[in-house]
Swiss-Prot record:
Interacts with NEUROD1. Interacts with AR. Expressed in splenic B-cells. Residues 1097-1111 have a biased composition (Polar residues). It comes from Mus musculus. Belongs to the krueppel C2H2-type zinc-finger protein family. This is Ras-responsive element-binding protein 1. Residues 163-174, 1155-1165, 1564-1580 have a biased composition (Basic residues).
Length: 1700
């Protein structure tokens, strides 16, 4: 967009008629020539440098009305004119990409995407050098050229003077004249007071005024300055804040006589970029006047300036100040001499003349030597009123005790000096605190009449802290009992107003730690390092300082403490000096203090009575020092609590405590996706919207959505000219959304129970509630663990208050004030919850446990700076893995590929949230012996078969019993506990130990569990150990995700956006972006478990129960039919507590297919997500993508984006049958979207530099474009890729790259193992075909289709059913020929004990073999054939799935499992194509072009996925149309072959077995089998049978390949949809009844079915009720249709998968 297109100029207003008109005219000329409004985009040279002024002038002239230059229409506002003019541009077809907000027509969808950023204010592209952000990558790269120039001549252009500075639009083309202005980062310009310095050297270095870092480039400096945004421009002495560095420097120089200094402590003025250059500001006076030297001297001493000229440099050597003339400099130098000498003399005199004791004595009497009081003019006289006093108080970072009369007006050091002789608390006491004092740079002399004189200390030496004279002056001038109005009565509001903005982080500069003092003599610095601003030691956070009360009590307190500690008063001073080191507690203790209440300084009430003060005991002191937690006197509520790190003042200590957390980096409100730490929940909610793309505030006028209300208001003001608050509010619509709940899910650690998700509202209630979990033994805690104990009788209590109550009642001798010390917080020794490591750490850190230090774990587990720390007296809880990289991040089996998708998500990190990568194969536990190491919970734990059924209870509160199930198991940990649990969404693990450890122990308690079959990457909050310890093991993300309690997802930390291949597998870039974003968005269930089953899997439906979403059926609940393993119960989960959970089973395929469409939120949630490998592509719709954004804008322009959401609801409403047609309809009905997608694809087509998207054919000129585009791809790719490699463990001959068996599957027997492998292949095929079909269904997410091919296929029950269908029909034909009675046995018994029988059954066709070798050869035959079957099955998948759904939920679990197995069949488009190609090779042979047709069909498929063009657009090019089903074909030959599927004609006949084939090459292949069969009779038979199945599926697959959209058939006969469902259910019943019929009946029925088999396969959608297949099915139903088995026997069903 040109800089002079009005909309293009984001930063400038829309008022430039002239500019706009030129753009319009150019557009008009372009459009006349047939071009699209590209003219708007072609950058025109911007007008001259004064164009802004000129434009404004013209605007003023023409403001009254706006005439369209093309049609003379008069518009009232410029915005209307712009909108109107754009309507002139729509005739070229650009209207397809018109902006719904401003009407601008754009050439392509991607241009529109970019343009929408203008309205949204998003700036996705950031300059790597200076961080300035841009809406388009082109602008960013244009901007980057400036840096290239900058490196050579950094500032050839003068920065603007402060008067000229303005916010520049980030859209500015920073070229030509624009460079003459300062292109500071838009939105981020830091006004750091640089004024124009035209003569800077080209190689000048820019210094950060805060930390003195050097930068070559001004942009770097400006960006860097943002890192100091949390270090507000505040005076360290008087806490006044400034907008600019210049203001602060000026203030410091003027008021505090303080100059900026560099890191070495030298004056830093002449090279300081923050200081303006030149003396032009002195122009207010005539330089020729006689007093000019004096004026300029005075002015330059307070207004720091830099010399510009090398010839005329008049700089003071002492203070580095510059002056405009020599005489000014000479005058200035004189000012240095007396000041320095005077101070030196004064210091030596004072130190020599009097001893410290004498001064202390005088101070006690309120006296001081007259020579100590320097007559300094009072610069400001504060009135003696509340507000002044409050202000004065707030000038100190450290809170003082309000009871001290002088403390309000005296700096901490002075207060320290007010007391009696030196008070030192006994060094052994735990309440030795550090005192971080700030530089004593300004004193207040309190005069006897209570007036306060502010006495500035002049000169640089003011920075020194231990200025004893000043301290003593302050002390001496304070009358002993001065009375000041109590702060509690002061109004709080003025203060709140004064300290308006809370800058985020960083304590104020430094304050050297001092010991706590209540003495008159100033304590020496503990740390020799003199505090110059910025040298704070990170390890010494300022501690709260509480003072003893007045000077008189101080003395008594001193004596009291001295007598207790046995110190004589005379030795106090030496003691103080000697003990400086002793009193420095170790860092751990400091950390503890930080984490305890002393984090928050609380001002104690002013009106404490003297008698209380005189009776100060150690307990009281301790309470005062640590900040009383619970028992505050009522007055305390009225005290104000200022923040030590910033200006804010709080009325409640709790609020302050929460606020301080944000400074310390331990805020519970941390973003899980990035490193953002919010000060409060609201800020976090706002921040999360940037990730989720959620925009709850909608402009009612143009329906544009905004993330933040302020933006919406600004939009209304600027775009719709709404001026009044009422108008603005009236036009903002708020759409409530789940973000707040999401935030609650992971950032309300203080109230939400991690185990059951209950929101307890109060943290204390939560802590007590957590004990109920512990007492159940969920986490392996002691069953009745009670954290509080009575010191007298050791009685344990659940709550502290109970213990106090007990002490009050039972131990009457305990004085009330000491009760607190009689409550012991027991953090028991090495309980089951503690690992050896913890014990060790506990030992190291010391064992003195006082109640103050044994606060509930949560207090200490708040992460600081990204890592969790624990109190010194507390071990790291066992759930915090000591290692930063858990072993579980990598597969335990060293033959498997490393999985780096979990890298960096170690439990120690704050933001990891993946429920671990459970990457263990059966061998992994054996491989990794962790008996000698601390138990690392990050290693995935093996699953016990029995536990698989304890599926996540759908109810939030059900987990406990199930986790409890683990209890009875042997407590010894398995050789390798491999369940890694990320216990808390934030890693801040704020729940007490037991809670979190629950998961751990649950994991530990299952020694003989079976190793997990695959890696599960659940992005699910861990609410319950049951959820964690069982569900992830099951790989049942669906269950988790559908669980209402769990719909608040965790967000794993996103990996880098650009592709970065990991070690062994190519991990596509966004391993978890989809998870992140979809989880943030309203469809959290888009995340699917990552299933990679390296090991062998078991029989078909073993994951059935586990995978069914809500299923919480315990083992026992499995239906009787499943005698073998209750795991395999196919019964629908009874416990699905919400319709959504139940949906996946009942709606089955319907839900799934619908959920595949983009924007499908509910569908997605319903989806079982069986073990699907990846995130559904739909989740891309949930990203903060432009498309989603546009979808929210209510305009038909983007109906393609909105369409899916509508379809979604329609489909879900319509139920199963409708679903099959939905996709096809969508397919046909979205040509507009095709155009969008086509345009999207072409938007960068002709760019020179081409970066290919790894997931789709799109090409991008910049990495940033690719990054943005990558957001449209989900996680699936990475998952599937990840799966690919483990898949290699299996020998899936024909599909080398394809998939490992299902994750949830646990192995039952070698036979069943083989079955599983076989089935995996069987399912793989359908999934593949299904994927292709999906692509047809969803033209919109074309790019994503690829990804979805693998996932979607696996997700849906339909795939299975499809494979069932195709295999059923094949089986019928095979059965007819071979009359295999055993097959019946195989199929019927496959679900029963037959699995364990020595016979080896083929899971695809049910055939039994005596020898395993025979079976494996037989399977190889299937592996060749099944890809075809898969393809064939696909067309029917959806219909069949629906049918099954109609019939009953039974199939749904089975499909869930099957696809899981077939999950990774097509991990990547490449693989998929490879497998298709392979099929083609196998199937093609020397045929009459059938192969070609098939290949061509594949071609169709491939382009369909590869190019964003949808199938519909391609269909037009195919000229041959089937008269029956209206499908189109490339050639007559293809059509002829296709017609055979309608006619049932099978012209090719095998001479040996008289079997007939639709395709010639099928016959040829079949005959090869006979040749092999001569060598091995059994094998021949098998392969023949396989071959037949393959041939059937081939003709079907040809059909489907050539016309992928088999739904079209269904569409053509809408009325058949219901019927289809019925026939499918017939097939279902056929499958089950098939099992129950006698072999003869079955054979007969299947013979009858055989002719129709190909027909059914070819076009399941159009199955005629009277078709032979239907008749056959009816026959079979007559044989024995028993619904219960259908429901319960998925095992058998899944084995029939290949047979029916």
């Amino acid at each position: 967009m040109t800089s002079n297109s009005p909309i293009g100029l984001e930063g400038s207003d829309l008022s430039s008629i002239n500019t706009m008109m030129s753009a319009v005219m150019s557009v008009a000329s372009v459009t006349e020539n047939g071009g699209s409004p590209q003219g708007i985009k072609s950058p025109m040279k911007p007008p001259g440098p004064n164009r802004i002024g000129r434009r404004n002038q013209e605007t003023k002239e023409e403001k009254s009305s706006y005439n369209c230059p093309l049609c003379e229409k008069i518009c009232t506002t410029q915005h209307q004119l712009t909108m109107h003019i754009r309507q002139h541009n729509t005739d070229t077809g650009g209207a397809d990409h018109a902006c719904s907000i401003c009407g601008k027509s754009l050439s392509s969808a991607s241009s529109l995407d970019r343009h929408m950023l203008v309205h949204s204010g998003e700036r996705p592209y950031k300059c790597t050098v200076c961080g300035q952000s841009f809406t388009t990558n082109g602008n960013m790269h244009r901007h980057m050229k400036i840096h290239e120039k900058d490196t050579n001549s950094t500032t050839a252009a003068a920065p603007p003077s402060p008067l000229k500075r303005r916010r520049l639009s980030s859209k500015r083309k920073l070229s030509h004249d624009a460079e003459s202005e300062d292109p500071g980062p838009a939105k981020k310009m830091v006004e750091d007071g640089q004024s124009g310095d035209l003569d800077k050297m080209s190689d000048e270095i820019f210094h950060c005024p805060v930390c003195f870092k050097e930068f070559v480039c001004k942009y770097e400096l400006e960006t860097h300055m943002e890192t100091h945004s949390d270090n507000p421009l505040r005076c360290d002495i008087c806490c006044v804040t400034f907008r600019t560095h210049r203001g602060l420097l000026r203030h410091n120089a003027l008021v505090h006589k303080q100059l900026p200094r560099d890191a070495m402590g030298r004056p830093f003025i002449q090279n300081n970029p923050s200081i303006p250059a030149g003396f032009h500001d002195l122009g207010f006076t005539d330089f020729s006047c006689r007093k000019f030297p004096r004026i300029s001297q005075a002015w330059c001493e307070t207004n720091l300036r830099r010399c510009i000229s090398e010839q005329h440099r008049f700089v003071c050597d002492t203070c580095d100040k510059a002056f405009p003339m020599l005489s000014s400099l000479i005058l200035h130098r004189q000012s240095h001499i007396p000041a320095d000498q005077g101070r030196e003399k004064l210091q030596t005199k004072t130190l020599a003349a009097e001893s410290l004791e004498q001064k202390a004595f005088l101070a006690l009497l309120g006296l001081q030597h007259t020579k100590d009081v320097k007559p300094a003019p009072a610069e400001e006289l504060l009135p003696d009123d509340n507000q002044a006093i409050q202000l004065q108080t707030l000038k100190y970072q450290l809170p003082q005790e309000p009871g001290c009369p002088t403390v309000l007006s005296v700096s901490p050091l002075d207060a320290a000096s007010l007391g009696g002789s030196l008070t030192v608390l006994p060094a052994t006491k735990e309440n030795m605190k550090h005192l971080s004092l700030q530089p004593f740079q300004k004193g207040f002399i309190i005069q006897p009449d209570s007036s306060i004189v502010v006495k500035p200390i002049s000169g640089e030496s003011a920075i020194e802290l231990a200025d004893i004279q000043q301290i003593l002056k302050m002390a001496a001038s304070a009358p002993p009992q001065i009375s000041l109005p109590p702060l509690s009565k002061a109004p709080a509001t003025p203060l709140q107003a004064i300290f308006k903005h809370m800058p985020p982080l960083k304590p104020k500069p430094l304050v050297t730690p001092r010991t706590v003092v209540a003495a008159s003599t100033p304590p020496p610095l503990i740390n020799a390092q003199q505090a110059s601003p910025g040298c704070i030691s990170p390890s010494l956070p300022p501690q709260s300082l509480k003072f003893l009360k007045g000077s008189v009590e101080a003395v008594s307190n001193v004596h009291l403490l001295q007598s207790k500690s046995g110190i004589q008063p005379s030795t106090t001073t030496q003691l103080f000096l000697q003990q400086a080191g002793v009193e420095l507690p170790g860092q751990p203790e400091m950390k503890t203090q930080l984490e305890q209440e002393s984090i928050i300084e609380a001002l104690l009430p002013l009106n404490m009575e003297a008698k209380i003060k005189q009776e100060i005991t150690e307990g009281d002191l301790k309470a005062i020092m640590t900040g009383p937690s619970g028992k505050k006197t009522p007055a305390m509520r009225k005290v104000l609590y200022p923040c030590r790190f910033c200006n804010q003042v709080f009325a409640f200590s709790g609020v302050l405590r929460a606020h301080v957390r944000s400074h310390l980096g331990i805020s519970p409100y941390q973003c899980n996706i990035c490193d953002y730490i919010a000060a409060d929940k609201a800020a976090l909610i706002r921040h999360i919207r940037t990730h989720s793309g959620e925009r709850p505030y909608i402009c009612k006028i143009c329906h544009y959505p905004f993330t933040v209300k302020a933006n919406c208001e600004r939009h209304l003001r600027k775009k719709h000219l709404k001026a009044t608050r009422k108008d603005i509010e009236k036009n903002i619509e708020y759409v409530s959304s789940p973000t707040a709940e999401l935030v609650d899910a992971f950032c309300a650690p203080e109230t939400v129970c991690r185990l059951c998700g209950e929101d307890l509202k109060h943290y204390r209630a939560l802590r007590i509630h957590m004990r109920t979990h512990c007492s159940r033994g969920l986490g392996g805690c002691h069953k009745g663990r009670k954290p509080f104990e009575c010191k007298e009788c050791n009685a344990p209590f659940v709550a502290k208050r109970n213990c106090i109550h007990h002490i009050l009642k039972q131990h009457l001798h305990v004085p009330e004030k000491d009760i607190e010390s009689y409550v012991l917080a027991t953090n028991s020794g090495l309980g089951p919850a503690d690992t050896p490591t913890d014990a060790a750490s506990r030992g190291e850190e010391g064992s003195c446990v006082t109640f103050a230090e044994c606060k509930p774990l949560a207090t200490f587990l708040e992460p600081q700076n990204g890592f969790l720390h624990s109190s010194p007296t507390q071990p790291l809880p066992s759930h915090i893995s000591v290692k930063l990289e858990p072993a579980s991040s990598f597969a335990m089996d060293f033959n498997e590929p490393l999985d780096f998708s979990q890298k960096g998500l170690a439990l120690v990190q704050v933001k990891q949230e993946n429920v671990s990568s459970l990457l263990t194969s059966s061998s992994s536990s054996a491989l990794y012996d962790c008996s000698m190491e601390p138990i690392d919970l990050s290693i995935p734990k093996s699953v016990k078969k029995g536990d698989k059924d304890t599926v996540v209870p759908s109810d939030a509160k059900k987990p406990e019993p199930e986790a409890g199930q683990a209890e009875p198991l042997s407590p010894r940990p398995p050789p390798c506990p491999t369940l890694s649990v990320t216990v808390e969404p934030k890693g801040s693990l704020e729940t007490p130990t037991g809670t979190v450890v629950a998961v751990t122990t649950a994991a530990k308690l299952e020694p003989h569990t079976q190793p997990l079959q695959g890696s599960v990457q659940l992005a699910v909050p861990i609410y319950s150990p049951a959820l964690v310890s069982n569900t992830p093991l099951l790989g049942n993300s669906a269950a988790l995700l559908n669980n209402p309690a769990l719909l608040r997802p965790l967000r794993p930390k996103p990996p880098l956006l650009l592709p970065k291949p990991s070690m062994t597998e190519e991990l596509p870039p966004l391993a978890s972006i989809a998870q992140i974003i979809s989880s943030v968005s309203s469809a959290p269930t888009l995340l699917k478990t990552k299933v990679a089953d390296p090991g062998p899997s078991i029989t078909s439906s073993n994951t059935v129960a586990t995978d069914s979403p809500g299923s919480s059926i315990p083992k026992a609940a499995a239906t009787p039919t499943d005698t073998t393993s209750s795991k395999e119960s196919s019964e629908p989960p009874p416990a699905a507590s919400s319709p959504e959970e139940a949906l996946p089973t009942e709606q089955g395929p319907a839900a799934t297919s619908s959920s595949r469409k983009r924007g499908r939120k509910r569908g997605l949630r319903n989806r079982p997500l069986p073990n699907s490998s990846a995130v559904d592509l739909d989740s891309s719709g949930e990203f903060a993508s432009i498309e989603k954004m546009l979808a929210t804008t209510d305009t038909n322009k983007f109906s393609p984006f909105l369409q899916t959401a509508e379809d979604d609801t329609q489909e879900e409403v319509a139920g199963a049958p409708a679903d099959q047609h939905g996709p096809a309809d969508e397919e046909q009905g979205s040509p507009a979207e095709d155009r969008l997608l086509r345009a999207k694809r072409n938007s960068y087509a002709n760019c020179l530099q081409k970066i290919n998207c790894p997931h789709c054919p799109r090409v991008f000129p910049w990495a940033s474009s690719l990054q943005r585009h990558m957001l449209t791809h989900t996680d699936s790719q990475s998952d599937t890729d990840t799966l690919t490699t483990p898949g290699e463990v299996l020998d899936l001959t024909a599909q080398a790259k394809e998939q490992p068996p299902a994750e949830g599957a646990s192995e039952i027997s070698p036979a069943s193992q083989d079955l599983a492998i076989k089935e995996a292949k069987a399912a793989a095929a359908p999934s593949e075909e299904e994927e292709e079909k999906e692509t047809e269904e969803n033209p919109e997410p074309e790019e994503e289709c690829r990804v979805e091919e693998s996932t979607g296929a696996a997700d849906a029950p339909e795939e299975d059913t499809a494979s069932n269908q195709s295999l059923d029909l094949d089986f019928a034909t095979k059965l007819m020929d071979f009359k295999l009675a055993e097959s019946e046995a195989g199929s019927v018994d496959s679900q029963g004990p037959a699995q364990q029988e020595p016979k080896h059954a083929c899971d695809t066709c049910g055939k039994n073999f005596k020898f395993l070798g025979t079976l494996s050869r037989h399977k190889k035959a299937h592996s060749c054939q099944e890809p075809k079957e898969e393809e064939a099955a696909a067309p029917s998948l959806e219909n069949e799935g629906v049918g099954r759904a109609v019939e009953g939920p039974s199939p749904s679990p089975e499909p869930e499992e099957k696809p899981a197995e077939s999950l990774a069949i097509d991990p990547t488009p490449g693989t998929r194509e490879a497998s298709v190609a392979k099929q083609n090779e196998e199937t093609e042979g020397p045929t009459d072009g059938e192969g070609t047709a098939e290949k061509r069909g594949d071609g169709d498929k491939r382009p369909k996925t590869d190019s964003p063009k949808s199938m519909a657009s391609k269909a037009d090019k195919r000229k041959k149309v089937c008269s029956v089903c209206n499908k189109r074909f490339w050639s007559l030959q293809d059509l002829t072959r296709h017609m055979r599927s309608h006619t049932g004609e099978r012209p090719y006949k095998c001479q040996t077995c008289e079997r007939t084939f639709t395709l010639k090459h099928s016959l040829v292949r079949h005959q090869r089998i006979h040749q092999k069969a001569r060598h091995s009779k059994h094998h021949g038979k098998d392969s023949d049978k396989d071959e037949r199945a393959e041939e059937d599926s081939e003709d079907e697959s040809t059909h489907s390949a050539t016309n992928p959209a088999s739904e079209n058939e269904a569409e053509s006969a809408p009325s058949t949809s219901n019927h289809v469902a019925v026939t499918r259910s017939r097939k279902e019943s056929l499958s089950t009844s098939g099992k129950e019929c006698s072999p003869e009946e079955r054979a007969a029925a299947e013979q009858a079915a055989e002719p129709s088999a190909p027909k059914e396969q070819a076009s399941p959608g159009e199955t005629d009720p009277q078709s032979p297949a239907a008749i056959v099915q009816d026959l079979l139903e007559l044989c024995g249709k028993r619904p219960a088995p259908i429901l319960a026997a998925t095992d058998g069903a899944s084995q029939l998968l290949g047979m029916e």
